[in-house]
Swiss-Prot record:
The lineage of its organism: Bacteria, Bacillati, Chloroflexota, Dehalococcoidia, Dehalococcoidales. InterPro entries: Nucleotide-bd_a/b_plait_sf (IPR012677), Ribosomal_uL23-like (IPR013025), Ribosomal_uL23/eL15/eS24_sf (IPR012678), Ribosomal_uL23_CS (IPR001014). The gene is rplW. Transmembrane segments: none annotated. It comes from Dehalococcoides mccartyi (strain ATCC BAA-2266 / KCTC 15142 / 195) (Dehalococcoides ethenogenes (strain 195)). Belongs to the universal ribosomal protein uL23 family. Gene3D superfamilies: 3.30.70.330. GO terms for molecular function: rRNA binding; structural constituent of ribosome. PANTHER family: 60S RIBOSOMAL PROTEIN L23A. Keywords: Ribonucleoprotein, Ribosomal protein, RNA-binding, rRNA-binding. One of its GO terms (biological process) is translation. This is Large ribosomal subunit protein uL23. Part of the 50S ribosomal subunit. Contacts protein L29, and trigger factor when it is bound to the ribosome. One of the early assembly proteins it binds 23S rRNA. One of the proteins that surrounds the polypeptide exit tunnel on the outside of the ribosome. Forms the main docking site for trigger factor binding to the ribosome.
Length: 94
């Protein structure tokens, strides 16, 4: 898997903005990515030093469309902790 396919998009919310003050940033990642791949992708894309990577899987939900039940897509997130002094400028000013 290409390292630029690992990181899908940054997830920006109120909770994630509070975590950014503690040098923790949240990204949506590819389903097949592991911690090593996420660490390499963040370090190469943003030129920072990653201390820790926590990953979680959010399963899809069942929704109704008329009489039919439809399964929404699941989501995989990574919470990335950076070394003190490093920042990802993508999250600043949000």
């Amino acid at each position: 898997m290409n390292l630029y396919e690992v990181l899908r998009r940054p997830l920006i919310s109120e909770k994630n903005s509070v975590q950014a003050v503690q040098n923790k940033y949240v990204f949506e990642i590819a389903k097949g990515a592991n911690k090593r791949m996420v660490k390499l992708a963040v370090e190469q894309a943003f030129n920072v030093t990653v201390e820790d990577v926590n990953m979680l899987h959010i399963p899809g939900k069942q929704k109704r469309m008329g009489r039919n039940l439809v399964q929404t897509a699941g989501l995989r997130k990574a919470i990335i902790t950076l070394k003190e002094g490093d920042k990802i400028t993508l999250f600043e000013g949000v």
